Amino acid sequence: MTWLGESTPVEAVIFDWGGTLTPWHDVDYAEESRALAAAVVGEGPGDAPQVLLEAATAVWTRSRDEHVSATLADIFTHAGLTHDEDLLHAYRDFWEPHTLTDPDVLPLLSRLKVDGVRVGVLSNTVWPRAWHEEFFMRDGVLELLDGAVYTSEVPGTKPAPQAFEAAMDAVGVTDPAACVFVGDRLFDDIWGATNVGMRTVLVPHSDIPAWQVGHSLGEPDAVVERLAHVYDVVASWRAA
């Protein structure tokens, strides 16, 4: 694929999180909903785990189709349930084993930083920033990030242009042609980033559920089988 910004130097590489920096895991969503239900306080309509499962599906479907962001609180609201944030520890404990950073990430980001490339993250998420930062800190990655955007804090989700523009702002780059976006999803990541003028790298690690696949498929500028190979792709573009 020919990239229209070939003469523009690469200044930043922005990564998707789930399925890219963190390997994709198939999880039991019914079990996830039971863990989430542990934060419910008071009475609510019907069986709380089932209602929360349906609410989460609706929230993520809206994110996919309308590119509207959401938070964990929005899932409870959609379910008609009240929750206590201090009781979310069971839900977080459920997810923690699935948040481990890919072993390639630390050396990859370190090499990019040595080369003077800015590094960022753009993640479609309902989780608070603090959770993501704690996971990155646990794995020794947080200090390597120049900026990060978590869509739980902004109005739109990938592939909306505003999400990518916010990520550019976070890493201090104004020209999308100077950015490379790395992700595992052809719609949210590749199509969305290409649409704003970024160069793209697909890391096809994820077996994405059909209900999460968007209506459009993007064409990446490069495809790599592991994150470590992203460095060579970026280096070749910087040398061109």
Residue ranges and their predicted role:
Residues 1-15, 27, 42-47, 106, ...:
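Asp-based, Mg2+/Mn2+-dependent phosphohydrolase catalytic module
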